[in-house]
Amino acid sequence: RLENVIYIELLRRCSNNFFDIYYYKETPRSKEVDFVVCNQDRAVELIQVAYDIEAEKTFKRETNSLLSASATLRCDKLTLIAFTQTRNYEAGGKCIHIVSAIEWLLRPMDN
């Protein structure tokens, strides 16, 4: 699965930089975020992974989860990794960077 590939790469990138990786779920039947990258107990990036975001329902579910967690965790760096798309999406005064999995895997980690 795509989430597993991203997780393994996050482990590789974060192990040398003193970052921790968490899964986030607000309440039992609510929104979740696949990866919360933290540095010293502060969320520095929220990452959602979805193979296909072409369907409006899927796109809204993934972006709404990021926006909701962003407000709760006070984190503005929001990334949605999809299999093929790269673009920016703005909502609620926030910018979600949508990036293809290949592009994300090939770029260096920015601290």
Where are these regions (language model features)?
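A cross-kingdom feature that marks ATP-driven nucleic-acid transaction machinery
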Residues: R1-N111
